[in-house]
């Protein structure tokens, strides 16, 4: 039997990955839906927020047995009372609400982990006021009040959504906010790779709204830069192959950056001898997917 646990894949930088979920203490977070990685305290490290909640616990084996027994008893009783009814679909006569009510429905707490650097994380759900129980699935982040820290919007099943304001007081760390504005040359900025340089530190992000479960977050790019009071430069690489370099970057504010190309990036050459060619042949394994012959 294999116990399920989360996977957190660390990019080793050499084409391989290592699962460090146990090492970071984030291997077990109940039934998890959205996992958001963002710098919620602007210290320069991405933190982790996880929504939780399963409206009906269909994994509960005891409840599964109760449901099976209830359905069997119901069907037998109905047939006894309607002997001449003919063929009837079970779902046309079964009390679905009563059946589902046999399944456990317990709200679960959400999880939040602070990134302390060097792949060390601390569970801060309670400290950050994010540990209340609910049936939550989708979640998105954005700086809704433009005060420099990232807020959360969480979808809850059968109850109103939550808008969770980040109330850092005072804000002890600095940030850089960017909004890439499409232009005629670059009508779509999605997929842009943004690298920020400040002193000896480097931050990297890719512009993609899709995050979490069935959710989309803000298209603004937000960097927490900790105690840094200045930024050397920002380099942006667009999917079409152009590069844009930005100097004189302001901190603790959001800047609109018109997507432009300062220089072109030469396409990467591929050795055709290392690719799959016309001589490659896939041998199909013959297998009958519908019938299996069992030999006594």
Functional labels for PLM-detected ranges:
Residues 4-12, 111-115:
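Beta-propeller blade signature
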Residues 1, 54-104:
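Short, conserved, GDST-rich strand-edge loop motifs in beta-rich repeat architectures
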Residues 10, 33-42, 137-144, 296:
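Beta-propeller blade termini
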Residues 23-28:
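Outer-membrane beta-barrel proteins
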Residues 15, 40, 53, 63-67, ...:
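Intrinsically disordered, compositionally biased low-complexity regions
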Residues 11, 49-53, 153-155:
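Residue-level marker for isolated small/hydroxyl-bearing positions within beta-strands
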Residues 12-16, 39-46, 116-120, 144-148:
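Secondary-structure transition into beta-strands, especially the periplasmic turns and strand N-termini
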Residues 102-109, 115, 120-136, 140, ...:
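Gly/Ser/Thr/Pro-enriched helix-cap/hinge segments flanking short amphipathic alpha-helices
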